[in-house]
């Protein structure tokens, strides 16, 4: 029996776009899903809540909602099961809850689970460190019309990578919106622009602009299946880890 077929993965948020993509990817790779729950309870399997799903699983993947985060983490803690959190739109209190849980169980918080985006983040960090603050940084992202949070979690991931490259905290140098704008762009800031429309799975562009030249580093997701494959890879990896807080760069060795 292979590791892929022996690790039982519980899926929270199974009815959503990512949940359906994970089910498709799991069937393609012969990965075992122990069950899945959605907004109305059981989606497949016989588990109506995260508590019963955690009991029957070796590791959990959560792509549900921020409102359900507390219950999902408590279920993982109760049964001492690793959990991957792909939910976006989290508050500072949510992040504190995740950090506390990571002292007792393995936790991955992933704004984006694709290999390409995480490689992009590594490149952005390196570029920001080498180019310096006299190069302006702007991050542009576009998603489908149904996405609620803006900027996207991935855009913020890329922003943090750029800020870390400069030895800064994103919260101190981010311009999340410029409407209305009455002053010129301030040197050293990182700007964000969010577009919403159609069925776009996820486009991200990081622009480094200086006098007379610019560098554009980008990633385009053509299907959610890339995120699903990354999430499953992370779940199999996390099942073997000790308690702690991890990121996708740890899974991918970046």
UniProtKB/Swiss-Prot annotation:
NADP(+) binds at residue 39. It is found in: Cytoplasm. The keyword NADP applies. Pathway: Amino-acid biosynthesis; L-lysine biosynthesis via DAP pathway; (S)-tetrahydrodipicolinate from L-aspartate: step 4/4. Keywords: Amino-acid biosynthesis, Cytoplasm, Diaminopimelate biosynthesis, Lysine biosynthesis, NAD, NADP, Oxidoreductase. It comes from the Bacteria. It catalyses: (S)-2,3,4,5-tetrahydrodipicolinate + NAD(+) + H2O = (2S,4S)-4-hydroxy-2,3,4,5-tetrahydrodipicolinate + NADH + H(+); (S)-2,3,4,5-tetrahydrodipicolinate + NADP(+) + H2O = (2S,4S)-4-hydroxy-2,3,4,5-tetrahydrodipicolinate + NADPH + H(+). GO terms for cellular component: cytoplasm. The keyword Cytoplasm applies. NAD(+) binds at residues 13-18, 86-88, 110-113. The active site is at 143 (proton donor/acceptor), 147 (proton donor). GO terms for molecular function: 4-hydroxy-tetrahydrodipicolinate reductase; NAD binding; NADP binding; oxidoreductase activity, acting on CH or CH2 groups, NAD or NADP as acceptor. PANTHER family: 4-HYDROXY-TETRAHYDRODIPICOLINATE REDUCTASE 1, CHLOROPLASTIC-RELATED (PTHR20836:SF0), DIHYDRODIPICOLINATE REDUCTASE (PTHR20836). Belongs to the DapB family. Catalyzes the conversion of 4-hydroxy-tetrahydrodipicolinate (HTPA) to tetrahydrodipicolinate. This is 4-hydroxy-tetrahydrodipicolinate reductase.
């Amino acid at each position: 029996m292979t590791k892929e077929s022996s690790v039982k993965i519980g899926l929270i948020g199974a009815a959503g776009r990512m949940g359906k993509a994970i089910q498709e990817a799991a069937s393609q790779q012969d990965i075992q899903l122990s069950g899945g729950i959605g907004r109305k309870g059981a989606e497949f399997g016989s588990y109506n809540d995260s508590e019963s799903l955690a009991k029957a699983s070796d590791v959990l993947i959560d792509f549900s909602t921020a409102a359900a985060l507390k219950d999902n983490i408590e279920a993982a803690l109760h049964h001492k099961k690793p959990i991957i959190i792909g939910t976006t739109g989290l508050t500072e209190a949510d992040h504190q809850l995740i950090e506390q849980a990571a002292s007792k169980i393995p936790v991955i918080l992933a704004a984006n689970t694709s290999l390409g985006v995480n490689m992009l983040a590594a490149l952005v960090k390196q570029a920001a460190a080498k180019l310096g603050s006299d190069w302006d940084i702007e991050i542009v992202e576009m998603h489908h019309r149904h996405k609620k949070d803006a900027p996207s979690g991935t855009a913020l991931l890329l922003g943090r990578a750029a800020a870390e490259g400069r030895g800064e905290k994103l919260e101190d140098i981010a311009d999340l919106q410029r409407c209305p704008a009455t002053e010129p762009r301030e040197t050293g800031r990182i700007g964000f622009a969010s577009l919403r429309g159609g069925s776009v799975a996820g486009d991200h562009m990081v622009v480094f602009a200086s006098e007379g030249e610019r560098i554009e580093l980008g990633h385009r997701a053509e299907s959610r299946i890339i995120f699903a494959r990354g999430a499953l890879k992370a779940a199999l990896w996390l099942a073997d880890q000790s308690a702690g807080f991890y990121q996708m760069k740890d899974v991918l060795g970046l």
